C-alpha cells in the first residue's frame, strides 16, 4: 500500500519512515521548506530518505513565509536555550504548520493513489502544539475525507500516544540511522546541545541507555552535562 509521509529529518519522522517501511508500505516522503532559518533538517531528510531508498520530494513553499513568520523558527526571535515549557514551546510554534503541510500531502496522496498520509506527532508535543493532538488528527482526517470523498485519504499519526523516548526505543529496534538526523533549532555545523529540542533529544537517548550516534564521545559527554545542569536548575526553580 502506498503512503505519503512528512519527513522533516528529525528523529521522530525518520523513525516513522522506518516504521512504515517495516509495515510493508511503499513510502513517498515529502520535505517542506517554508522559510525555516536554516536547512540542516532538510539536508538530513535527504540523507535519511536516500539511506532508506524511498521516493523523496523536497517542496519549496517558502513564498508563504511572510504569511506565517512567527516566533523563533521562522521569525526574528532568538532560539530559547531551555527545556520545553509552555512559554518555550509557544515561541517555537509555526502557526497552522501541520494543517498546511498535511493538506498538501493529502492532495499529493490523491494524485499518486495513496490511501494514507502519516506524520510523526507524539505525546511529548501534545500538551502545547495544537496540531499534534489527537483531536486535531481526528478533525483533519474527517476534513480530508470530506474534501476527497471520491478518492478517500486517511490522516494518521501512529506515534500520538508515544513519548520521544518511546520513539527512539522503537527506532533502535528498526535500525534507524540516527546519525543522519538533525534536531537542533540552530543551523550551526554541530548541534548547540542546549535548545529545547536538543535537550529533549539527549533525554530520549539517555532514557534508552545509549549515546546519541550523531554526536562524538566528547559531544555526548557535554550534552549529558548540559542536560543534567539545566535539569537541576529547572527543578530548583520549581521547588
Curated annotation (Swiss-Prot):
<keyword id="KW-0436">Ligase</keyword>
<dbReference type="InterPro" id="IPR014729">
    <property type="entry name" value="Rossmann-like_a/b/a_fold"/>
</dbReference>
<feature type="binding site">
    <location>
        <position position="192"/>
    </location>
    <ligand>
        <name>Zn(2+)</name>
    </ligand>
</feature>
<keyword id="KW-0547">Nucleotide-binding</keyword>
<comment type="similarity">
    <text>Belongs to the QueC family.</text>
</comment>
<keyword id="KW-0067">ATP-binding</keyword>
<dbReference type="GO" id="GO:0008270">
    <property type="term" value="F:zinc ion binding"/>
</dbReference>
<keyword id="KW-0479">Metal-binding</keyword>
<feature type="binding site">
    <location>
        <position position="184"/>
    </location>
    <ligand>
        <name>Zn(2+)</name>
    </ligand>
</feature>
<dbReference type="Pfam" id="PF06508">
    <property type="entry name" value="QueC"/>
</dbReference>
<protein>
    <recommendedName>
        <fullName>7-cyano-7-deazaguanine synthase</fullName>
        <ecNumber>6.3.4.20</ecNumber>
    </recommendedName>
</protein>
<dbReference type="GO" id="GO:0005524">
    <property type="term" value="F:ATP binding"/>
</dbReference>
<feature type="binding site">
    <location>
        <position position="195"/>
    </location>
    <ligand>
        <name>Zn(2+)</name>
    </ligand>
</feature>
<dbReference type="InterPro" id="IPR018317">
    <property type="entry name" value="QueC"/>
</dbReference>
<feature type="binding site">
    <location>
        <position position="198"/>
    </location>
    <ligand>
        <name>Zn(2+)</name>
    </ligand>
</feature>
<comment type="pathway">
    <text>Purine metabolism; 7-cyano-7-deazaguanine biosynthesis.</text>
</comment>
<feature type="binding site">
    <location>
        <begin position="7"/>
        <end position="17"/>
    </location>
    <ligand>
        <name>ATP</name>
    </ligand>
</feature>
<comment type="function">
    <text>Catalyzes the ATP-dependent conversion of 7-carboxy-7-deazaguanine (CDG) to 7-cyano-7-deazaguanine (preQ(0)).</text>
</comment>
<keyword id="KW-0862">Zinc</keyword>
<dbReference type="GO" id="GO:0016879">
    <property type="term" value="F:ligase activity, forming carbon-nitrogen bonds"/>
</dbReference>
Amino acid at each position: 500500500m502506498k503512503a505519503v509521509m512528512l519527513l522533516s529529518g528529525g528523529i521522530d519522522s525518520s523513525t516513522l519512515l522506518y516504521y512504515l517501511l517495516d509495515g510493508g508500505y511503499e513510502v513517498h516522503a515529502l520535505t517542506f521548506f517554508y522559510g525555516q532559518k536554516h536547512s540542516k533538517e532538510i539536508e538530513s531528510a535527504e540523507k535519511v530518505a536516500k539511506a532508506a531508498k524511498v521516493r523523496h520530494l523536497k517542496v519549496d513553499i517558502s513564498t508563504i513565509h511572510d504569511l506565517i513568520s512567527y516566533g523563533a523558527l521562522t521569525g526574528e526571535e532568538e532560539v530559547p536555550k531551555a527545556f520545553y515549557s509552555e512559554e518555550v514551546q509557544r515561541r517555537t510554534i509555526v502557526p497552522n504548520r501541520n494543517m498546511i503541510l498535511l493538506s498538501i500531502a493529502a492532495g499529493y496522496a490523491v494524485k499518486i493513489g495513496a490511501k494514507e498520509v502519516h506524520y510523526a506527532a507524539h505525546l511529548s508535543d501534545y500538551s502545547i502544539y495544537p496540531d499534534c493532538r489527537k483531536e486535531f488528527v481526528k478533525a483533519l482526517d474527517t476534513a480530508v475525507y470530506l474534501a476527497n470523498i471520491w478518492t478517500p485519504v486517511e490522516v494518521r499519526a501512529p506515534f500520538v500516544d508515544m513519548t520521544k523516548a518511546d520513539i527512539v526505543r522503537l527506532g533502535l529496534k528498526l535500525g534507524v540511522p540516527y546519525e543522519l538526523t538533525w534536531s537542533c533549532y540552530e543551523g550551526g555545523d554541530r548541534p548547540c546541545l542546549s535548545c529545547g529540542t536538543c535537550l529533549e533529544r539527549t533525554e530520549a537517548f539517555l532514557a534508552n541507555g545509549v549515546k546519541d550516534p550523531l554526536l562524538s564521545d566528547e559531544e555526548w559527554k557535554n550534552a549529558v552535562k548540559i542536560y543534567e545542569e539545566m535539569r537541576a536548575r529547572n527543578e530548583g526553580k520549581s521547588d
